[in-house]
């Protein structure tokens, strides 16, 4: 096994451990003009991974959104559906808290 493959294997293991140990909080907040916004905090991902997950979420939920200061922001109230998508991505149910 080459060093590159070994490093990739470790990165995969670390990513899985991060998903298991993450404490993701999903909450809704009313923003400007009374518009609901879903916030996902505590995802413990690097910027690129978080941006990729945000893109998947936006496509699945047919909504707009962005990442700001490590927090995923989605337009609309998508708390339940966002939790289901995170479970499919490998996050455990006990690590997801819907507020």
Which sequence ranges carry the predicted segments?
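Long, charged, low-complexity intrinsically disordered regions
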Residues: 1-41, 45-51, 59, 66-68, ...
């Amino acid at each position: 096994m080459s060093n590159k493959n070994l490093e990739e294997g470790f990165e995969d293991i670390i990513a899985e451990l991060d998903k298991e140990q993450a404490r993701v909080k999903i909450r809704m907040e009313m923003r400007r003009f009374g518009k609901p916004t879903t916030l996902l905090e505590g995802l413990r991902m690097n910027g690129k991974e978080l941006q990729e997950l945000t893109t998947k979420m936006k496509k699945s939920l047919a909504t707009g959104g962005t990442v700001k200061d490590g927090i995923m922001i989605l337009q609309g109230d998508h708390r339940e559906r966002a939790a289901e998508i995170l479970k499919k991505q490998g996050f455990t149910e006990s690590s997801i808290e819907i507020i």
